[in-house]
Each structure stands twice: as C-alpha cells, then as structure tokens.
Amino acid sequence: MPYSLEKTDSLVTDAEEKILRLKNDLSVKCGGKVNIITEIKMAFTVIGELANYCSSQKPYAVVMGTQGATALERTLFGSNTIMAIKHLACPVIVVPPKAKFHTIKKIGLACDLKKVDANIPFSQLRSLITQFKAELYILHINPKGEKGYTAETTTETRAIQNMLYDLHPHYRFIDSDDTEIALEQFAQTNKLDLLITVPKRHNIIDKIFHKSHTKKLVMQTRLPLMAVHLN
C-alpha cells in the first residue's frame, strides 16, 4: 500500500528533527569548527540515492554505521553499509557502534598481493597516510597449508615497496584460514586505528562481508573500516 501524503510528511518531519539533533551534537563535539550541511532525501533505495549524491557532490568519503536502535534498523543499516561498500565509487568508511574516536596513527591495508600495480589505489593511499602522518601496515593473510612466500609474493611485495618506499610500510604475513578473525586479532594486538580494504570480485572484501558470521564480526568490531575503490 503506498504511503499517504500525511504519512510522508510525518516521516520527513521526524527525520528533520533527528538530523537537527545530530547536527547540533556534532557541532558541539567539533567545537563549531566544522561546517555541517544537512539534507534529507526521499528515495526508493538508499544506495541509489547515495550514488546520485556522490556523483553530484564528489565527497571525499561516505561514512556509515552498522547498528540501529531496533533489530530491523540493525539489519537495514548493516545491509545498506555492505551494499554501499560494494557499489559506491567513492571511499566508504564504516564506523562500528563500539568505535571510539582518537587520532589515526596506525593504518592497516588488507592486501592479497595479486597484481598490486593494478589493484591498489596508491595515490589515495599515499594521500591518506601522509595527511594523518600515520604508520602503514601491509597485511597479507595466507591460508594454512598453502605456500606463503612464493616468487609472486616477493615480486608483488617489492612492487608495493617501490611505490611506497618513502612511507616505510611494515609488512605482516599471517597464516590463517579465518581471514576476518586474523585481521581483527592483528588490529587489536597492534592497536590499529583504521583498516583499509580494496573491494574487488573474489577478493578479501568478499571474505569479510559475504558470510553471515563475518558480517556479525564486522558489526561488532571496534575498528573503523575504509573501503577504497580503484579509480
């Protein structure tokens, strides 16, 4: 049954009240130093409207959460976030409900070491690391039982080093059959502030977001994730 005009107006009014409260809260937390612009859109799909907005406004990134007040909201937030990661062209930063804000000092890049010249957006990565003056950790998860240090591994690692030598990245090779668990444990142990992934088909992003139990892990983690797409 289509919504009535009265129902639509009520939804818009409710959204306006909530977004105004959020704007005021953010303004206080930022000390009034950040210009905050709010906008409400009525759309058939969240991702479709976000894609249109990104196309016209060219934001640096889209920031999304993974949890709402109700079970339905949590499901919708999680689904929309995953769809945004897969389909939006601009970077998507996922901020879990348990995340605490502090200066970004350590950034991890989850990498499968496959054709890195074509599959890693080095310019965006360099800009991010330089802007925050952060340490960069290159993380490669290798399934147990597979040969970890192959000729390809050496070649691809050298390619990354050639591109990012002045940033002095740290390399970590981890043997694990549970990609998401290994990343979570490394992030906690080494106090990473942000984990970057580069979504592509059959890559690490699918292992993180495809299965239901890993979706739950991501939604419960304290570590913000940033999906950066290739240009």
Regions found by a protein language model. Give the residues of each.
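Charged helix-capping and loop-helix junction motifs
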Residues: 77-80, 152-157, 209-214
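Residues at the starts of beta-strands that form the adenosine-phosphate
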Residues: 35, 105-106, 133-137
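Short secondary-structure boundary segments
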Residues: 66, 140, 198-200, 229-230
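Anionic-ligand binding region
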Residues: 119-126, 160
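Structural beta-alpha unit
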Residues: 24-62, 164-215, 219, 223
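Glycine/threonine-rich flexible loop motifs
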Residues: 71-76, 205-209
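Acidic, proline/glycine-rich short linear motifs
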Residues: 1-17, 137-159
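Intrinsically disordered or low-complexity boundary/linker segments at protein termini
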Residues: 61-66, 86-121, 219-231
